[in-house]
Amino acid sequence: MNKATANERKKLRLLLVASRKHLSRGDLRSLIRFLESEDCGFEIKLQFSDPKEQPELLELHRLVAIPALIKLDPQPKQIFAGTSILEQLKNWLPRWEQEDILISSGLGINLRQKESENGRTRNELLLEDENLVLRQENETLSNQIESQERLLRMVAHELRTPLSAAKLALQSQALGQIDLIKLQEVVKRRLEEIESLSKDLLEVGTTRWEALFNPQEANLANIAAEVILELEKFWLSRGIGINTDIPADLPNVFADQSRMKQVLLNLIENALKFSNDGDTVEITMLHRTNQWVQISVSDKGPGIPEEEQQRIFLDRVRLPQTSNETSGFGIGLSVCRRIVEVHGGKIWVVSQPGEGSCFYFTVPVWDKRNKSLEPLTLTQG
């Protein structure tokens, strides 16, 4: 696309419908930078709107998902949504520029009356464009429905942990192992967790669950200690040891504390579940590079065949050799993968059948210079 000079640039009025949390995403920040750059080729007037403050926009523009970028002027209106808004926009900019040149030269009027070189009328071309937009909207809607279904499965999985812990506390109190005050503390904390999950469900109708996370400065050692304490009854009752190797100078990370707790809780709970009585579970954290902290959780359980090591991170995958003995990995590891990826990290497993498994994941280091609590744009080697 030829870059126009400032005087030659035509105006393009766009509306970005997105919440404040959406605007912290790397893809939207890249979109905004592109629209503000010389590479765009148009004189852009970009407006922002938060759907929570102006919910009527969802109905007015018939939006099926947010964030969404809307071309308001020149007509016809066009909507881009999903996680590839910038790529979609770049594909359309040359076409809009060409249309503008044709109309400005007077050829645009003839195009409306005559057939184009390939035999299609202007109206047919416009209809084709509208069909493309509808296909994009349909794809976005399908992705939104899939995201909502994943969130429902995730919440159902997460509800089991606080409910099981509350049930265990009731049993412990009945056996005289804890007093009533301790029971009340446990039940209160678990009810708060369930309430938090309910809030996520209330938001799922208007946004993707990935946008629900609230990254901030977090101390992974403290989060791990909290998880280990919560699972104390499970590992003490079976004589399983938990060893931690966490440096005193481990830097804080940039992460959603509740989501990080989900990941650690799931990985440690799995390690305990697949360990034999008397085994040891190892939890290690290290400052791998200037930008990343690496966490690992290892056990001496049955291990995972190599051909299964990628599949276990997919939705609702259970290992054949453990399905009859345990509840399997279920949805938990797919949830871990999505949470880690939302933070920009990676998750993987190293395992040999009969020799145990070690799960690794990475989290970005907190940058003290970042005062706006926005995610860093990081790359891993």
Curated annotation (Swiss-Prot):
Name the EC number(s): 2.7.13.3
UniProtKB keywords: ATP-binding, Biological rhythms, Kinase, Nucleotide-binding, Phosphoprotein, Transferase, Two-component regulatory system
- Catalysed reaction, written as an equation: ATP + protein L-histidine = ADP + protein N-phospho-L-histidine
Under InterPro entries, the record lists: HATPase_C_sf, His_kinase_dom, HisK_dim/P_dom, HisK_dim/P_sf, KaiB_domain, Kinase_SasA, Sig_transdc_His_kin-like_C, Thioredoxin-like_sf
Q: Quick one: signal sequence residues?
A: none
* Pfam families, A to Z: HATPase_c, HisKA, KaiB
For the Histidine kinase domain, which residue ranges apply? Answer: 154-367
Asked if the record carries the keyword Ribonucleoprotein, the reply is: no
Q: Which GO terms describe its cellular component?
A: plasma membrane
Q: Which GO terms describe its biological process?
A: circadian rhythm
Q: Name one GO molecular function term.
A: histidine phosphotransfer kinase activity
Note the Gene3D superfamilies from the entry. 1.10.287.130, Glutaredoxin, Histidine kinase-like ATPase, C-terminal domain
Instruction: PTM Phosphohistidine: list the residues.
Output: 157
What are the disulphide bonds in this sequence?
none
The record's section on NCBIfam families has:
PRK09303.1
Give the multimer and partner information: Homooligomerizes. Interacts with KaiC. Participates in the KaiBC complex, whose core is composed of a KaiC homohexamer and 6 KaiB.
The protein's job, in short, is: Member of the two-component regulatory system SasA/RpaA involved in genome-wide circadian gene expression. One of several clock output pathways. Participates in the Kai clock protein complex, the main circadian regulator in cyanobacteria, via its interaction with KaiC. KaiC enhances the autophosphorylation activity of SasA, which then transfers its phosphate group to RpaA to activate it. In addition to its output function, recruits fold-shifted KaiB (KaiB(fs)) to KaiC to cooperatively form the KaiB(6):KaiC(6) complex (independent of SasA kinase activity).
Regarding domains, what does the record say?
Answer: The N-terminus interacts with KaiC, while the C-terminal histidine kinase domain autophosphorylates and is probably responsible for self-oligomerization. The N-terminal domain stimulates the C-terminus to autophosphorylate.
Name used for this protein in its record: Adaptive-response sensory kinase SasA
Q: Which organism is it from?
A: Prochlorococcus marinus (strain SARG / CCMP1375 / SS120)
Q: Which gene encodes it?
A: sasA
